[in-house]
Amino acid sequence: MNNTFRYLNGYAMQYGLFLGVWYILVSAAYVGSFAMPILSSFCFFLFLSIPFLIALLTARFRSLVEGEFSFNKGFSFAFLTSLYACVWQALAVYIYLAYIDNGFVFDSFQASLERPEVKEELERSGIMPQIMEITNGGGIESLVDGLRMITPATYTAVIIYFNFIIAPVLSAFVALTLKRRKREVR
């Protein structure tokens, strides 16, 4: 049992690095989408492809395992792969926000919210009054200033927490889809 887990964990670490690079690409496309709006479509595509990529990586691991590939093995592998990927993404986001960004993300976010068509849509949908209420009348600038006050470590923690909520659900679907029963010998 211990060797089986080490084998599974070793491959989860390797594939987690690959998936982590994918997560980092999603984050980079999101940041880049403020300067180049076409990247928002690319970011959306990359984000939606994550469950399929996890399933593909788990299927590749399953092909290396002889005999039964139980739900538990599939779940453990998919969950650990997601966990290791999340660590890489969290590290990259922390380094970016703490040392590289210099306020670009928040300045770009504020600029996009202050565009006339966006302001009009915020008013029409009833979100602007909520922003005014949350910020005690400060508006968009006050909202973005509040986001700036959050430390890079907190954004990193949010990424990890989000992963701990989503990864078990994705892992369960992947494990159910890819489980393989032992074939009976006649």
What is each PLM-predicted segment?
Residues 80-103:
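C-terminal halves and exits of single transmembrane alpha-helices
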